[in-house]
Every structure is written in C-alpha cells, then in structure tokens.
Amino acid sequence: MKNLGNMMKQAQQMQARMQEMQSKLAEVEVNGVSAGGMVSILLNGKGELKQIKLDKSVVDPEDVEVLEDLIVAAFNDAKNKVEAHMAEETAKLMGGLKLPPGFKLPF
C-alpha cells in the first residue's frame, strides 16, 4: 500500500507540473524561417500560428508553389523549435519523477 500511496503522490505532482508547464508554454513564442529569413512564421508554445511574414521578393503570382513550399518549411522549422523547447521544459519540470521506459511527456 505504501508504494500505491507514493505512486498517487507522484501522479499528483506530475499533474501539477504539467499544468504549470502548459501555462508557461502559452507564453513562449518561437520563430521559424526559410529562404534565409524571407519567410517567417511565429508560433506560440502550444503550436498555434500567431503570424506569417513574407518578403515581397518571394511572392510571385506565376510561381505560387515555391511560396507554399517556403511557408511549409518555415512552419516545420518553428514546430521543431517548439518541440525542442517543450522537451527541455518537460525535462526540467519532471526531473526526479520516474517514468516507465518509453513513456513520453507531454501525454
């Protein structure tokens, strides 16, 4: 029973830490770029799109496909940065809590 009590306590601690991390992530803003910064995408820590900036030189009505690819590349850059930040914050907040092998946070 002592182990069950410890597990419940750890679960409560984990839940509180996750809530803290989620509120912090909402405040984080990450910029992803492509084409040497001519396409820029701003995401918050929750992965929500906040802003897209395009240099006029990448806007060619005759070649929309290139612009689409640049936007996707900038978004993926920002998304990767958000995920790296989340992993770093998760490691900080969850330090000391033992998780089963292969268990990934956030859930």
Swiss-Prot record:
Q: Name one GO cellular component term.
A: bacterial nucleoid
Keywords of this entry: Cytoplasm, DNA-binding
Which cellular compartments is it found in?
Cytoplasm, Nucleoid
Superkingdom of the organism of origin:
Bacteria
For molecular function, the Gene Ontology terms on record are: DNA binding
Identify the main location. Answer: cytoplasm
Q: Sorted alphabetically, which NCBIfam families does this protein's record hold? A: DNA_YbaB_EbfC
Q: What is this protein for, i.e. what is its function? A: Binds to DNA and alters its conformation. May be involved in regulation of gene expression, nucleoid organization and DNA protection.
**Subunit and interaction comment:** Homodimer.
Instruction: Please state which protein family the record places this protein in.
Output: Belongs to the YbaB/EbfC family.
**Protein name listed in UniProt:** Nucleoid-associated protein RC1_2305
Specify the species. Rhodospirillum centenum (strain ATCC 51521 / SW)
Which lineage do the record's taxonomy fields give for this organism?
Answer: Bacteria, Pseudomonadati, Pseudomonadota, Alphaproteobacteria, Rhodospirillales
